[in-house]
């Protein structure tokens, strides 16, 4: 589960919006 989220989050969010990445990652 964690691996899937990290993968999708790293790929999708990175191409989606940096702001979302910061909110989820941080």
UniProtKB/Swiss-Prot annotation:
Its EC number is 3.6.5.-. Keywords: GTP-binding, Hydrolase, Magnesium, Metal-binding, Nucleotide-binding. Mg(2+) binds at residues 1, 19. A motif (Effector region) lies at residues 16-24. GO terms for molecular function: GTP binding; hydrolase activity; metal ion binding. GTP binds at residues 1-2, 13, 16, 19. The keyword Magnesium applies. InterPro entries: P-loop_NTPase. It catalyses: GTP + H2O = GDP + phosphate + H(+). Belongs to the small GTPase superfamily. Rheb family. Binds GTP and exhibits intrinsic GTPase activity. This is GTP-binding protein Rheb. The gene is RHEB.
């Amino acid at each position: 589960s964690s691996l899937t989220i990290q993968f999708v989050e790293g790929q999708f969010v990175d191409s989606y919006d940096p702001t979302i990445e910061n909110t989820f990652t941080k």
